[in-house]
Protein backbone atom coordinates (compact mmCIF):
# COMPACT_ATOMS: atom_id res chain seq x y z
CA UNK A 1 0.00 0.00 0.00
CA UNK A 2 1.84 4.29 -1.53
CA UNK A 3 0.47 2.72 0.64
CA UNK A 4 2.47 7.84 2.41
CA UNK A 5 1.52 6.03 2.84
CA UNK A 6 3.08 8.50 3.34
CA UNK A 7 4.58 7.12 4.18
CA UNK A 8 6.38 8.27 5.54
CA UNK A 9 6.13 6.14 7.86
CA UNK A 10 4.21 2.66 7.61
CA UNK A 11 3.38 3.37 4.06
CA UNK A 12 4.67 1.79 1.00
CA UNK A 13 2.09 0.39 -1.20
CA UNK A 14 2.36 -2.55 0.85
CA UNK A 15 5.60 -1.01 1.89
CA UNK A 16 4.62 2.56 1.15
CA UNK A 17 2.08 1.63 3.77
CA UNK A 18 4.75 2.85 1.56
CA UNK A 19 3.12 6.03 2.53
CA UNK A 20 4.48 5.44 5.79
CA UNK A 21 7.97 4.22 5.38
CA UNK A 22 9.70 1.06 6.45
CA UNK A 23 9.22 -0.51 9.88
CA UNK A 24 11.99 0.57 12.20
CA UNK A 25 12.98 0.03 15.81
CA UNK A 26 13.44 3.75 16.40
CA UNK A 27 11.49 6.90 15.71
CA UNK A 28 14.62 8.97 15.16
CA UNK A 29 15.64 10.14 11.71
CA UNK A 30 18.63 12.20 10.70
CA UNK A 31 18.05 15.79 9.61
CA UNK A 32 19.78 16.36 6.28
CA UNK A 33 20.46 19.99 7.16
CA UNK A 34 22.61 18.79 9.99
CA UNK A 35 20.62 19.51 13.11
CA UNK A 36 20.53 16.16 14.86
CA UNK A 37 17.04 15.86 16.25
CA UNK A 38 14.00 13.84 15.44
CA UNK A 39 13.12 16.19 12.59
CA UNK A 40 12.35 14.78 9.19
CA UNK A 41 14.97 15.35 6.46
CA UNK A 42 14.96 18.25 4.05
CA UNK A 43 13.24 17.66 0.71
CA UNK A 44 15.00 16.89 -2.53
CA UNK A 45 14.10 18.80 -5.66
CA UNK A 46 10.65 17.76 -6.94
CA UNK A 47 9.99 15.31 -4.09
CA UNK A 48 6.60 15.52 -2.41
CA UNK A 49 6.74 16.89 1.12
CA UNK A 50 3.61 15.34 2.61
CA UNK A 51 0.96 12.72 1.99
CA UNK A 52 -2.63 13.48 3.00
CA UNK A 53 -5.46 10.99 3.23
CA UNK A 54 -9.14 11.36 3.99
CA UNK A 55 -9.48 7.95 5.54
CA UNK A 56 -12.76 6.02 5.31
CA UNK A 57 -12.27 4.74 8.85
CA UNK A 58 -13.59 7.92 10.46
CA UNK A 59 -13.51 10.43 7.53
CA UNK A 60 -10.76 12.44 9.23
CA UNK A 61 -7.83 13.97 7.38
CA UNK A 62 -4.51 12.34 8.27
CA UNK A 63 -1.22 14.00 7.35
CA UNK A 64 2.10 12.22 6.90
CA UNK A 65 4.98 14.66 6.39
CA UNK A 66 7.85 13.15 4.40
CA UNK A 67 10.38 15.99 4.33
CA UNK A 68 10.90 19.66 5.18
CA UNK A 69 10.87 22.37 2.51
CA UNK A 70 13.87 24.69 2.23
CA UNK A 71 14.32 28.41 1.62
CA UNK A 72 11.64 29.48 4.07
CA UNK A 73 8.92 27.58 2.19
CA UNK A 74 6.42 25.59 4.20
CA UNK A 75 4.68 22.39 3.20
CA UNK A 76 0.92 22.80 3.35
CA UNK A 77 -0.93 20.18 5.37
CA UNK A 78 -4.36 21.44 4.28
CA UNK A 79 -6.50 19.60 1.76
CA UNK A 80 -6.65 21.86 -1.29
CA UNK A 81 -6.73 20.50 -4.84
CA UNK A 82 -6.48 24.02 -6.29
CA UNK A 83 -3.38 25.44 -4.59
CA UNK A 84 -1.06 24.52 -7.46
CA UNK A 85 1.13 22.50 -5.11
CA UNK A 86 -0.96 19.36 -4.86
CA UNK A 87 -1.76 16.21 -6.80
CA UNK A 88 -5.07 14.65 -5.77
CA UNK A 89 -5.82 10.97 -6.35
CA UNK A 90 -9.21 10.12 -4.90
CA UNK A 91 -9.04 10.11 -1.10
CA UNK A 92 -5.34 11.02 -1.00
CA UNK A 93 -3.31 14.07 -1.86
CA UNK A 94 0.41 14.61 -2.39
CA UNK A 95 1.77 18.02 -1.34
CA UNK A 96 4.82 19.73 -2.85
CA UNK A 97 7.05 22.58 -1.73
CA UNK A 98 6.51 24.47 -5.00
CA UNK A 99 4.12 24.34 -7.94
CA UNK A 100 3.63 20.88 -9.38
CA UNK A 101 5.76 20.23 -12.45
CA UNK A 102 3.84 20.19 -15.73
CA UNK A 103 5.52 16.88 -16.59
CA UNK A 104 3.54 15.21 -13.78
CA UNK A 105 0.13 16.52 -14.83
CA UNK A 106 -1.05 13.62 -16.96
CA UNK A 107 -2.69 10.27 -16.35
CA UNK A 108 -0.32 7.35 -16.01
CA UNK A 109 -0.21 4.83 -18.82
CA UNK A 110 -0.08 1.11 -18.10
CA UNK A 111 3.66 0.81 -18.67
CA UNK A 112 4.72 4.17 -17.26
CA UNK A 113 6.75 4.56 -14.10
CA UNK A 114 4.29 6.29 -11.78
CA UNK A 115 6.11 6.77 -8.49
CA UNK A 116 9.67 6.45 -7.22
CA UNK A 117 10.37 5.90 -3.54
CA UNK A 118 13.89 6.26 -2.13
CA UNK A 119 14.59 4.86 1.33
CA UNK A 120 17.83 5.64 3.15
CA UNK A 121 18.91 3.56 6.13
CA UNK A 122 22.06 2.92 8.13
CA UNK A 123 23.66 -0.08 6.47
CA UNK A 124 24.69 -1.58 9.82
CA UNK A 125 21.92 -0.72 12.27
CA UNK A 126 19.11 -0.59 9.65
CA UNK A 127 17.87 2.60 11.31
CA UNK A 128 15.67 4.62 8.95
CA UNK A 129 17.30 7.89 7.88
CA UNK A 130 15.03 9.32 5.20
CA UNK A 131 12.28 8.69 2.66
CA UNK A 132 11.91 10.67 -0.57
CA UNK A 133 8.94 10.20 -2.89
CA UNK A 134 8.64 11.39 -6.50
CA UNK A 135 5.48 11.32 -8.63
CA UNK A 136 5.84 11.02 -12.39
CA UNK A 137 2.16 11.01 -13.39
CA UNK A 138 -1.33 10.81 -11.89
CA UNK A 139 -2.72 7.38 -11.05
CA UNK A 140 -6.23 7.16 -12.59
CA UNK A 141 -9.43 6.39 -10.69
CA UNK A 142 -9.89 2.81 -9.48
CA UNK A 143 -6.13 2.27 -9.63
CA UNK A 144 -3.28 2.21 -7.15
CA UNK A 145 0.38 1.32 -6.66
CA UNK A 146 0.09 -2.36 -5.69
CA UNK A 147 2.87 -3.96 -3.69
CA UNK A 148 3.82 -6.33 -6.49
CA UNK A 149 4.06 -3.55 -9.07
CA UNK A 150 7.50 -2.25 -8.18
CA UNK A 151 11.08 -2.91 -9.17
CA UNK A 152 13.78 -2.40 -6.56
CA UNK A 153 17.47 -1.55 -6.61
CA UNK A 154 19.93 -1.29 -3.71
CA UNK A 155 23.15 0.69 -3.53
CA UNK A 156 25.55 1.65 -0.75
CA UNK A 157 26.87 5.18 -0.24
CA UNK A 158 29.31 5.40 2.64
CA UNK A 159 27.47 4.27 5.77
CA UNK A 160 24.06 4.37 4.09
CA UNK A 161 22.09 1.78 2.16
CA UNK A 162 19.89 3.34 -0.52
CA UNK A 163 16.82 1.37 -1.59
CA UNK A 164 15.02 2.71 -4.65
CA UNK A 165 11.59 1.40 -5.63
CA UNK A 166 9.79 2.17 -8.89
CA UNK A 167 6.01 1.73 -8.87
CA UNK A 168 3.48 1.37 -11.68
CA UNK A 169 -0.25 2.11 -11.57
CA UNK A 170 -2.57 -0.85 -11.87
CA UNK A 171 -6.34 -1.13 -11.77
CA UNK A 172 -7.70 -2.86 -8.71
CA UNK A 173 -8.20 -6.56 -9.28
CA UNK A 174 -10.99 -8.69 -7.81
CA UNK A 175 -9.89 -10.18 -4.51
CA UNK A 176 -9.31 -13.90 -4.17
CA UNK A 177 -10.44 -15.70 -1.04
CA UNK A 178 -7.06 -15.43 0.70
CA UNK A 179 -6.22 -11.88 -0.45
CA UNK A 180 -6.09 -8.85 1.83
CA UNK A 181 -8.84 -6.55 0.58
CA UNK A 182 -7.61 -3.64 2.67
CA UNK A 183 -5.45 -2.88 5.68
CA UNK A 184 -6.05 -0.36 8.44
CA UNK A 185 -3.06 1.11 10.25
CA UNK A 186 -4.23 2.56 13.54
CA UNK A 187 -1.68 4.77 15.28
CA UNK A 188 -1.61 6.95 18.35
CA UNK A 189 -2.30 10.06 16.26
CA UNK A 190 -3.13 8.79 12.75
CA UNK A 191 -5.27 6.24 10.97
CA UNK A 192 -4.15 5.12 7.51
CA UNK A 193 -6.19 3.09 5.03
CA UNK A 194 -4.79 1.04 2.17
CA UNK A 195 -6.99 -0.73 -0.35
CA UNK A 196 -5.53 -3.73 -2.14
CA UNK A 197 -8.35 -5.13 -4.30
CA UNK A 198 -12.12 -5.11 -4.93
CA UNK A 199 -14.28 -7.68 -3.17
CA UNK A 200 -16.39 -9.95 -5.40
CA UNK A 201 -20.02 -9.06 -5.90
CA UNK A 202 -22.03 -9.79 -2.77
CA UNK A 203 -19.05 -9.42 -0.43
CA UNK A 204 -17.61 -6.44 1.41
CA UNK A 205 -14.32 -5.59 3.07
CA UNK A 206 -14.93 -5.02 6.79
CA UNK A 207 -13.80 -2.05 8.87
CA UNK A 208 -14.48 -3.64 12.27
CA UNK A 209 -11.07 -4.27 13.84
CA UNK A 210 -12.18 -7.58 15.36
CA UNK A 211 -12.73 -8.87 11.81
CA UNK A 212 -9.00 -8.73 11.00
CA UNK A 213 -7.39 -12.05 10.10
CA UNK A 214 -3.96 -10.65 10.96
CA UNK A 215 -2.64 -7.86 13.19
CA UNK A 216 0.89 -6.50 13.27
CA UNK A 217 2.52 -3.89 15.49
CA UNK A 218 5.15 -1.56 14.01
CA UNK A 219 7.06 1.53 15.05
CA UNK A 220 7.97 4.04 12.36
CA UNK A 221 7.33 7.77 12.66
CA UNK A 222 4.46 6.67 14.90
CA UNK A 223 3.39 3.48 16.64
CA UNK A 224 0.93 1.59 14.47
CA UNK A 225 -1.11 -1.58 14.73
CA UNK A 226 -2.03 -2.80 11.26
CA UNK A 227 -5.26 -4.76 10.78
CA UNK A 228 -5.47 -6.81 7.58
CA UNK A 229 -8.94 -7.72 6.30
CA UNK A 230 -10.39 -10.27 3.91
CA UNK A 231 -13.67 -10.10 2.01
CA UNK A 232 -16.73 -11.36 3.84
Curated annotation (Swiss-Prot):
PTM details?
Contains 8 disulfide bonds.
Q: Where in the cell is it found?
A: Secreted
Q: What is its main location?
A: secreted
Provide the tissue specificity. Expressed by the venom gland.
Superkingdom: Eukaryota
Q: Which keywords fit this entry according to its UniProt record?
A: Disulfide bond, Secreted, Signal, Toxin
Q: Which GO terms describe its cellular component?
A: extracellular region
Signal peptide coordinates: 1-21
Residues annotated as coiled-coil are: none
Record-level Gene Ontology MF annotations: toxin activity
Q: Its family?
A: Belongs to the scoloptoxin-11 family.
Report the protein name in the record: U-scoloptoxin(11)-Sa3a
Q: What is the species of this protein?
A: Scolopendra alternans
Cite the source lineage.
Eukaryota, Metazoa, Ecdysozoa, Arthropoda, Myriapoda
